[in-house]
From Swiss-Prot:
One of its GO terms (cellular component) is periplasmic space. It is found in: Periplasm. It comes from Pseudomonas brassicacearum (strain NFM421). One of its GO terms (molecular function) is endopeptidase inhibitor activity. Pfam families: Inh. Belongs to the protease inhibitor I38 family. This is Alkaline proteinase inhibitor. Residues 1-25 form the signal peptide. Inhibitor of the alkaline protease. Keywords: Metalloenzyme inhibitor, Metalloprotease inhibitor, Periplasm, Protease inhibitor, Signal. InterPro entries: Inh/Omp19 (IPR021140), Protease_inh_b-brl_dom (IPR016085).
């Protein structure tokens, strides 16, 4: 009986390692540029804001519309986004844990992936920069 318990434990350990590797490999898959291409809303908020309070105060000073292009360049209101980041973003690329923006002066800004279709980071000022799909754009 002890040898069958050891065999079962060994089989279970092997199965757990295999499942863990598969799950990790899936989590590291990069999104294709075509999957993310389109209009995105960049929103600047304080850590205390929630979706409801943010919706009530959306105004040009805390929101700008940018376009992630398939060729991994940016369009739209990149100057607005650049004011918050300190360097106007001109290129972008996906990473396993989010999205990076590259500025005109080669600065790199990393936005971590959050639930669903939005990315975010906390700026040095403590404000939160969130990049989310433009709600008025139809889903791909």
């Amino acid at each position: 009986m002890p040898s069958s318990v050891q065999a079962t434990a060994g089989l279970l350990a092997t199965l757990m390692m295999f499942c863990g590797e598969v799950a990790m490999a899936r989590s590291l898959l990069l999104a294709e540029p075509s999957q993310l291409a389109g209009q995105w809303q960049a929103v600047l908020s304080s850590p205390q804001d929630n979706a409801q309070t943010q919706a009530m105060q959306d105004k040009p000073s805390n929101s700008c519309l940018v376009e992630l292009k398939v060729d991994q360049t940016l369009g739209g209101q990149t100057d607005c986004l650049g004011q918050w980041l300190g360097d106007e973003p001109v290129r972008w690329f996906t990473e396993p844990d989010g999205l990076s923006l590259i500025g005109k002066q080669d600065s790199r800004t990393h936005l971590g992936l959050r639930q669903g279709d939005h990315y975010q980071m906390t700026l040095k000022s403590g404000l939160i920069l969130r990049l989310e799909r433009n709600k008025s754009q139809s889903a791909h």
